[in-house]
């Protein structure tokens, strides 16, 4: 027996009833879906991962032009460079804080390299760094 006009209709489980406002709701939903679909179709660019691979490769070719390097070895060297960079930056930051300065200068970098790297390696790193800063300063003028 169909329900009378005065009686309440049983819930349809969240679904829209067959008559009334359903077509209008579908049109609105259709518009939203179309907008969302066009947003979904937009391709996301690959997130770029910054590495030192190209620079490591260039140095390798300067030193040993006929030698190659595996992906795993490149990954290890990249991790090594990141680790040393982080250690030097952290130490330079501490040195600047000790001296109540808000700027890290070449002096802090040089001191942190001397503290982090052992003996002869530190001497070579400092001399190469000084040479690089001098070259940069002369080319900037």
Curated annotation (Swiss-Prot):
Protein modification: Monoubiquitinated by the ubc2-bre1 complex to form H2BK123ub1. H2BK123ub1 gives a specific tag for epigenetic transcriptional activation and is also prerequisite for H3K4me and H3K79me formation. H2BK123ub1 also modulates the formation of double-strand breaks during meiosis and is a prerequisite for DNA-damage checkpoint activation. Acetylated by gcn5 to form H2BK11ac and H2BK16ac. H2BK16ac can also be formed by esa1. Acetylation of N-terminal lysines and particularly formation of H2BK11acK16ac has a positive effect on transcription.
Matches recorded under SMART domains: H2B
InterPro entries attached to this UniProt entry: Histone-fold, Histone_H2A/H2B/H3, Histone_H2B, HISTONE_H2B_site
Pfam families for this protein: Histone (PF00125)
Gene Ontology MF term list: DNA binding; protein heterodimerization activity; structural constituent of chromatin
Region (Disordered): 1-49
Highest taxon listed in the record's lineage: Eukaryota
Residue ranges with Low complexity bias: 11-22
Biased composition (Basic and acidic residues): 1-10
Modified residues (N6-acetyllysine): 8-9, 15, 26
Family affiliation: Belongs to the histone H2B family.
Name listed for the protein in its UniProt record: Histone H2B
Annotated source species: Aspergillus niger (strain ATCC MYA-4892 / CBS 513.88 / FGSC A1513)
Gene from which the chain derives: htb1
